[in-house]
């Protein structure tokens, strides 16, 4: 019994998969714990993490728990919930871990989930790397290098990027397993998982995996026959099909975004138009990552949110350079050179994101996995010249540091010439990064000088040093990030994360609110509809609307107070102005509101509250209409100036030219003498529209419903974005939905009191995607059953290198050897004397062990 217990304990202790997971868990716990304690149990960072990741998680969590999976009225002016949030979190298993917990707990789960992600990335990194290492300890080192690389730490800012970091090694591991053992099904499941967790990153993973696969075939690292190749392709297709339940709705949503059609071309596809970007790419391999939105080494590289981070803690590029300098031919060397080339050529870099023109390096986690693998292989290879690789790394690091740190800049200010030294924006931060890189190199030198002779000691010491550097530089990075935003206890924690508990206003959920110069996505924190949003994936009709009135809409809806017209059109009732900042909605004396029609109401939860006295409830009708071409002829406006188009939207319904005849019998064409637009007329238009609005309006889990008293047949407008998934009923009868006012919806209602209007939303592509998923699942099961029944041939294996036939010169080159004379290699066998006959041979001598054994036998 004791022996069995001891064996079990030993097997658990020797389980390096568990070691990898718990090592990653422990290191990430040390990284995040100080910040979780400081923020009262929450992990808060800065920028996108605070204003996107945190509110998105809570919004989606509440939507799933309430069953509101169709239309999200809390996202911008309204959005397809599945299409908008599949990019961020819907496919993430980490998000679904929050569902059993109450809504108030979500903010406290962000830190533990990040810790879990780092632990899982360490585990999956080990799963991939351990196949290729001689020692499990070096595989563990490689796993930590991957999980805590500069890319991973940089993208704490983008919390949802870590799902791709976690799952990508499983894709390569499944492919490796197929090629080594022909094990069926794993690759299909890995493809499905990678596509489900994030379709954007999946595009880059497909590109990288194709290069990985065909390069290894070309280099003869793998062999595959036609049958197995076709079966592998079938698994890839089935895996893609399995993911269609999320993929199809997501693609249908993303295709509405104009940013997806901006392809790289011309000289921009050949060379980066900003020369600093080349240096930024180089520095990301030799130094810890810059903060997102705060590039320091190259301030004007145009790469603020590009995810340029690929530094391997402790080792940097030493192991990679050492591996690349070996003369041995290996597919990994070619893979690394190809990857570095693709990073430097714009159109090759863009191939990881469907050739989009926007610059991002969000595929570098795949490159860091290859770099981590090369580093640990170099550690195990005695022929690697570490002295030379460390020297190269030191020279490059020092050169970059000296050039950026001391380069003089001459300027003439008020007639006097001044000189400044250093190209960086933040010298203290810059020299801190330099110090971390140089201390890491010094630690590597120490390890090789004093620990290299004893392998076990060397690997353990390396792992300890790697862990210390990883924890230290990660804490330093997060601490720097937190200095870029205001103290979280000033406003974010007490007022935003409290969920508007102290705000009690009439109609807050049935109208939209406006947050003046406030935190992005402030309405999401409170769970109320707003006209502001910081969200990349929204209906194309929203972008079309804002574009038509001159308001930029790329990743956020942030119409300034100059655009007062849309406040009436979009049914804004309440405006919130931070009472702790220097941006005053009505001036310091609160006597001159920036938007006409607003009056001070009171103060609550850190905000001055203003009420729109000319508020128009959602759902109202018009007397007049104008065509789209007439609308386009009006002045557009700009980012900080209102145009006639915006004001015309409250005077007349804008209809498409080909539908004008339909509206002639219901509405009047706007007369020429009523086409003067100004602030005074705007307020009167608001009063006119409010007189003919719905008596009630309510959001539902399937859309929204309203009721109106109609004195005649009329068109009722709703400022809800138009999408193909909408259907409508009036008094229980289906009616057609009209696309009006450049991207919004309207229905025709009959005369009568208490006319009910019901809008229902069904996610476009969800049914089709679900059907494809079911069919793919059935085909995968049938495929696996068929493969199980058929006799399987063992995959071809390459024999030992000594038995391979190859060129004599190649052998000499790969082994770093030279021969005194050319010619074939001849094996000289040591000659032995002829075996004597049994008669002449003396009896064999008895060994002490045999004699003692015979004596014991005799004793028995």
Q: How would you describe each model-predicted region?
A:
Residues 51, 55-62, 93, 228-232, ...:
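Periplasmic/ER-lumenal interhelical loops and adjacent helix-loop junctions
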Residues 100, 426, 432, 458-714, ...:
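Soluble catalytic regions of membrane-associated enzymes that act on cell-envelope
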Residues 222-230, 319-343:
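Membrane-interface helix-loop-helix junctions at transmembrane boundaries of multi-pass membrane enzymes
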Residues 1-36, 231, 457-465, 778-843, ...:
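Start-transfer (signal-anchor) and selected internal transmembrane alpha helices
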Residues 34-132, 137-169, 193, 197, ...:
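Active-site lumenal/periplasmic loops and adjacent helix-entry segments of GT-C-fold
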Residues 182, 201, 331-497, 751-809:
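Contiguous transmembrane helix-bundle modules in multi-pass membrane proteins
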Residues 6-10, 53-56, 660, 665-807, ...:
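Active-site-proximal, structured, solvent-exposed surfaces of multi-pass membrane proteins
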């Amino acid at each position: 019994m004791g022996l069995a217990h001891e064996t079990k304990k030993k097997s658990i202790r020797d389980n390096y998969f568990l070691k990898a997971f718990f090592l990653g868990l422990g290191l990430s716990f040390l990284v995040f714990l100080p910040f979780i304690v400081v923020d009262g149990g929450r992990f808060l960072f800065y920028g996108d993490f605070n204003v996107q990741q945190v509110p998105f998680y809570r919004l989606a969590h509440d939507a799933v728990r309430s069953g509101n999976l169709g239309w999200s009225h809390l996202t911008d002016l309204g959005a397809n919930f599945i299409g908008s949030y599949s990019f961020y979190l819907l496919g993430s298993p980490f998000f679904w871990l929050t569902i059993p917990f109450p809504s108030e707990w979500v903010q406290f789960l962000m830190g533990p989930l990040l810790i879990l992600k780092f632990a899982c990335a360490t585990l999956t990194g080990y799963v991939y790397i351990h196949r290729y290492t001689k020692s499990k300890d070096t595989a563990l080192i490689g796993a930590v290098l991957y999980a805590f690389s500069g890319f991973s730490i940089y993208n704490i800012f983008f919390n949802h990027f870590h799902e791709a970091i976690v799952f990508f090694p499983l894709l390569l591991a499944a492919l490796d397993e197929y090629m080594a053992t022909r094990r069926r099904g794993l690759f299909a499941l890995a493809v499905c998982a990678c596509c489900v967790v994030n379709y954007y990153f999946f595009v880059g993973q497909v590109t990288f995996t194709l290069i990985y696969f065909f390069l290894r075939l070309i280099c003869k690292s793998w062999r595959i026959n036609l049958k197995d190749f076709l079966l592998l392709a079938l698994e890839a297709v089935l895996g893609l099909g399995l993911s269609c339940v999320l993929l199809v709705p997501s693609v249908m949503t993303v295709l509405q975004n104009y940013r997806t059609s901006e392809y790289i071309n011309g000289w921009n596809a050949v060379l980066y138009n900003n020369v600093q970007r080349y240096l930024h790419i180089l520095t990301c391999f030799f130094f810890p990552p810059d903060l997102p939105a705060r590039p320091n080494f190259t301030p004007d590289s145009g790469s603020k949110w590009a995810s340029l981070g690929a530094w391997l803690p402790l080792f940097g590029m030493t192991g990679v350079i050492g591996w690349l300098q070996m003369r041995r031919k290996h597919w990994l060397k070619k893979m690394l050179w190809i990857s570095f080339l693709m990073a430097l050529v714009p159109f090759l870099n863009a191939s990881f994101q469907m050739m989009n023109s926007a610059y991002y390096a969000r595929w570098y986690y795949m490159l860091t996995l290859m770099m981590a693998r090369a580093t640990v292989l170099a550690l195990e290879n005695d022929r690697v010249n570490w002295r030379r690789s460390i020297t190269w790394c030191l020279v490059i690091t020092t050169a970059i540091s000296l050039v950026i740190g001391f380069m003089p800049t001459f300027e003439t200010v008020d007639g006097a010439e001044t000189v400044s030294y250093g190209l960086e924006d933040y010298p203290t931060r810059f020299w801190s990064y330099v110090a971390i890189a140089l201390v890491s190199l010094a630690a590597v030198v120490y390890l090789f000088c004093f620990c290299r002779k004893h392998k076990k000691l060397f690997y353990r010491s390396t792992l300890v040093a790697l862990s210390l550097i990883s924890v230290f530089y990660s804490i330093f990075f997060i601490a720097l990030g937190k200095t870029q935003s205001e103290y979280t206890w000033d406003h974010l924690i007490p007022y935003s994360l409290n969920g508007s508990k102290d705000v009690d206003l009439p109609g807050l959920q049935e109208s939209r609110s406006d947050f003046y110069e406030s935190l992005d996505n402030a309405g999401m924190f409170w769970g109320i509809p707003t006209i502001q949003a910081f969200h990349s994936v929204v209906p194309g009709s929203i972008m079309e609307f804002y574009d038509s009135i001159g308001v930029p809409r790329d990743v956020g809806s942030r119409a300034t107070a100059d655009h007062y017209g849309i406040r009436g059109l979009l049914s804004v009732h309440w405006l919130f102005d931070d009472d702790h900042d220097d941006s005053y909605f009505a001036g310091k004396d609160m006597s001159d509101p920036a938007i006409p029609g607003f009056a001070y109401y009171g103060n609550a939860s850190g905000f001055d509250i203003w009420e729109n006295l000319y508020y128009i409830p959602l759902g109202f009708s018009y007397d007049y209409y104008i065509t789209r071409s007439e609308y386009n002829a009006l002045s557009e406006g700009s980012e900080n100036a209102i145009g006639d188009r915006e004001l015309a939207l409250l005077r007349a319904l804008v209809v498409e030219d080909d539908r004008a005849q339909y509206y002639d019998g219901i509405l009047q064409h706007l007369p020429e003498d009523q086409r003067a637009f100004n602030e005074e007329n705007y307020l009167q238009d608001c009063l006119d529209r409010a007189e003919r609005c719905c008596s009630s309006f309510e959001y539902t889990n399937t859309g929204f419903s309203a009721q109106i008293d109609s004195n005649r047949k009329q068109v009722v407008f709703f400022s809800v974005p138009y999408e193909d998934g909408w259907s409508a009923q009036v008094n229980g009868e289906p009616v057609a939905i009209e696309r009006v006012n450049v991207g919004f919806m309207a229905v025709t209602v009959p005369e009568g009191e208490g006319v009910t209007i019901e809008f229902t939303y069904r996610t476009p592509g969800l049914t089709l995607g679900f059907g494809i998923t079911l069919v793919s699942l059935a085909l995968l099961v049938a495929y696996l059953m068929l493969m199980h029944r058929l006799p399987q041939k063992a995959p071809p294996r390459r024999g030992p290198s000594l038995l391979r036939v190859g060129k004599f010169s190649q052998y000499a080159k790969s082994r770093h050897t030279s021969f005194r004379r050319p010619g074939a290699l001849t094996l000289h066998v040591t000659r032995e004397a002829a075996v004597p006959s049994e008669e002449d041979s003396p009896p064999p001598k008895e060994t002490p062990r045999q004699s003692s054994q015979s004596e014991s036998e005799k004793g028995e």
